[in-house]
C-alpha cells in the first residue's frame, strides 16, 4: 500500500503515447537484444503487473492510478511492439482515484478485470469488477459490474485475484481486520464466490504479518510512511508441478522498502480452502531482494506459460534503488523471468535477475 499520491504526469504521458485503440500499437524505447533474447525491465515504470495467456495472445496490465490500460501481444517479452488500449476511465468520483493492481481474467466466455479504487482517500479503497462480453478484450466495452462487498462493515480491500478449484471459484485479496486508526495491518483473506463479482461466503483470514520479514516499513535511509503499516498483500494463485498442492504467493512488508518480498501459503488440493488450518505459511520469504544484482523490493507476482506451454514465467515488479517511494515518483518497474521446479515439484522462483541482462525468450515465441 502507499499513503502518498505520486507525481504521475510524466509516467502517464509515457504510457499513453500511442495507446488509444487496437489499431495503434504503442512504441517505446527498449534496450537492444537479439531476436531470440530479451532484457528487463518490461517498462521503465509500472507497479503490480499482471498478465494472462489466452488463445496465443498475452493480455497484460499494471497500475496507472487514474485509468486501466490493457496491452495485447504474442511476445510477452517485447512490450515495445504490443498493442495498447485504455479500457476503463472511471467517471464516478467514489472510485476514480488510485486504481491499483488490475488483473484480467477470462471466466465463462467473458472478460473480467478486478482492481481497487477509492475517492482520493486510500482509507476508502474497495474492490471493483469490470465485465466485457466480447470474444476479444481489446474490442467491445468493459462495463462496471459493481464493488465486491468483502464484509458487512464495508471494509477496506485491495489487490484481488480469483481462481477456480474443483468447480468452485474463490477470491483472495488483501484487507484490514478492522478500520485503521493509528496503524495499519493488511492481511490475506479468501472467500467462495457466487459469481465473478459476488462473494458467497464470509471472508476467511489465512495470513497476517507475523514474521519480522513481513513487518518492515522503514527504509534504510530512515524514510517511512506517516504511521506503521504491516503488509500482506498481492495474493496470486499457482500450483505444484503435479497440481496436488495449491499455492498462494503474497507480498510482505512495505512496497516502498527494499524489504518488500514474496511469502508463500500452501494447501493440499483436497483440503477445505476456507479452513485456515488448511493453509501452511513458509517461515521465510521465497523471493526477495538481491544485493548482488541490485534488485530491491520484488513482489506483485503473476504467472504465465510460454507460448508452447513447456515453461512457466513469473512477472513481478521491483526497483533498482534501495529507498522507495514514500512520497517520490514511482520507482518500480515490471520484469519477467523463467521459474524452475525443485526436487519436490514445487516452484523455484530463484533470485531476481539484474536489469539489462540478456535472457532467452520463452519457448515457442514467434521470432520477428
What spans do the regions from the language model cover?
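Bacterial Sec-dependent N-terminal signal peptides
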Residues: 1-30
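Carbohydrate-active catalytic/glycan-binding domains of CAZyme proteins
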Residues: 19-368
Amino acid at each position: 500500500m502507499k499513503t502518498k499520491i505520486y507525481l504521475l504526469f510524466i509516467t502517464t504521458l509515457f504510457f499513453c503515447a500511442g495507446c488509444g485503440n487496437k489499431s495503434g500499437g504503442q512504441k517505446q524505447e527498449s534496450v537492444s537484444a537479439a531476436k531470440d533474447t530479451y532484457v528487463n525491465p518490461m517498462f521503465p515504470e509500472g507497479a503490480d503487473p499482471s498478465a494472462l495467456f489466452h488463445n496465443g495472445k498475452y493480455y497484460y496490465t499494471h497500475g496507472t492510478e487514474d485509468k486501466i490500460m490493457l496491452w495485447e501481444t504474442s511476445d510477452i517479452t517485447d512490450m515495445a511492439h504490443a498493442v495498447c488500449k485504455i479500457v476503463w476511465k472511471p467517471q464516478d468520483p467514489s472510485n476514480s482515484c488510485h486504481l491499483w493492481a488490475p488483473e484480467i481474467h477470462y471466466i465463462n466466455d467473458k472478460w473480467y478485470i478486478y482492481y481497487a479504487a477509492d475517492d482520493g482517500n486510500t482509507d476508502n479503497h474497495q474492490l471493483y469488477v469490470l465485465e466485457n462480453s466480447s470474444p476479444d478484450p481489446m474490442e467491445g466495452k468493459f462495463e462496471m459490474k459493481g464493488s465486491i462487498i468483502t464484509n458487512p462493515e464495508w471494509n477496506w480491500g485491495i489487490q484481488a485475484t480469483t481462481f477456480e478449484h474443483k468447480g468452485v471459484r474463490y477470491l483472495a485479496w488483501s484487507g484490514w481486520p478492522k478500520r485503521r486508526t493509528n496503524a495499519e495491518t493488511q492481511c490475506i483473506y479468501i472467500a467462495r464466490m457466487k459469481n465473478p463479482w459476488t462473494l458467497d461466503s464470509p471472508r476467511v483470514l489465512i495470513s497476517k504479518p507475523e514474521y519480522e520479514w513481513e513487518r518492515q516499513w522503514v527504509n534504510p535511509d530512515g524514510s517511512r510512511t506517516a504511521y506503521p503499516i504491516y503488509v500482506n498483500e498481492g495474493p496470486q494463485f499457482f500450483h505444484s508441478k503435479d497440481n496436488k498442492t495449491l499455492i498462494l504467493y503474497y507480498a510482505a512488508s512495505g512496497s516502498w522498502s527494499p524489504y518488500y518480498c514474496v511469502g508463500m501459503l500452501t494447501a493440499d488440493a483436497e483440503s477445505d480452502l476456507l479452513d485456515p488450518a488448511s493453509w501452511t505459511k513458509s517461515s521465510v520469504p521465497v523471493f526477495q531482494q538481491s544485493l548482488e544484482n541490485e534488485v530491491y523490493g520484488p513482489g506483485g507476482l503473476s504467472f504465465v506459460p510460454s507460448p508452447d506451454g513447456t515453461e512457466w514465467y513469473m512477472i513481478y515488479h521491483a526497483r533498482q534503488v534501495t529507498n522507495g517511494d514514500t512520497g517520490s515518483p514511482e520507482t518500480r518497474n515490471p520484469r519477467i523471468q523463467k521459474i524452475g521446479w525443485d526436487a519436490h515439484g514445487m516452484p523455484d522462483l530463484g533470485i531476481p535477475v539484474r536489469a539489462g541482462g540478456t535472457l532467452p525468450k520463452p519457448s515457442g515465441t514467434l521470432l520477428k
